[in-house]
Amino acid sequence: MSISKDDILNAVAEMSVMDVVALIEAMEEKFGVSASAAVAAAGPAEAADEQTEFNVVMTSFGEKKVAVIKAVRGATGLGLKEAKDLVESLGVVKEGVEKAEAEELKKTLEEAGASVEIK
């Protein structure tokens, strides 16, 4: 006579929480495994889903190119030529910044007339 999985699940469903905890501990001891290992492995996957570093990318400098160049110079500390080249290339303005800093930079550049994305 063998017990089916459904019989085991029904028996566990009728147990109290304390009985289930005791059953898990007994199974860990008998089979030399740990139920917490699966939970620990799932933890880093959740952390990977949340992005912590962002890139601020300019998609257009609009009609106010000079104002955008000034805003880029102020935000990055670049010289005039470097800031002008960066604005004209429509590339990444800043890489690997925190979300708050990225949002602030986006706001500053958009006020100057640029179109900006945070990636």
UniProtKB/Swiss-Prot annotation:
Keyword Acetylation on entry: no
Keyword Phosphoprotein: no
Signal peptide: none
Xref: InterPro entries: Ribosomal_bL12 (IPR000206), Ribosomal_bL12_C (IPR013823), Ribosomal_bL12_C/ClpS-like (IPR014719), Ribosomal_bL12_oligo (IPR008932), Ribosomal_bL12_oligo_N_sf (IPR036235)
Cross-referenced CDD domains: Ribosomal_L7_L12
Biological process according to GO: translation
Keywords recorded for this protein, A-Z: Ribonucleoprotein, Ribosomal protein
A Pfam family recorded for this sequence: Ribosomal_L12
Assembly, per entry: Homodimer. Part of the ribosomal stalk of the 50S ribosomal subunit. Forms a multimeric L10(L12)X complex, where L10 forms an elongated spine to which 2 to 4 L12 dimers bind in a sequential fashion. Binds GTP-bound translation factors.
Family: Belongs to the bacterial ribosomal protein bL12 family.
The protein's name in its UniProt record: Large ribosomal subunit protein bL12
Species: Colwellia psychrerythraea (strain 34H / ATCC BAA-681)
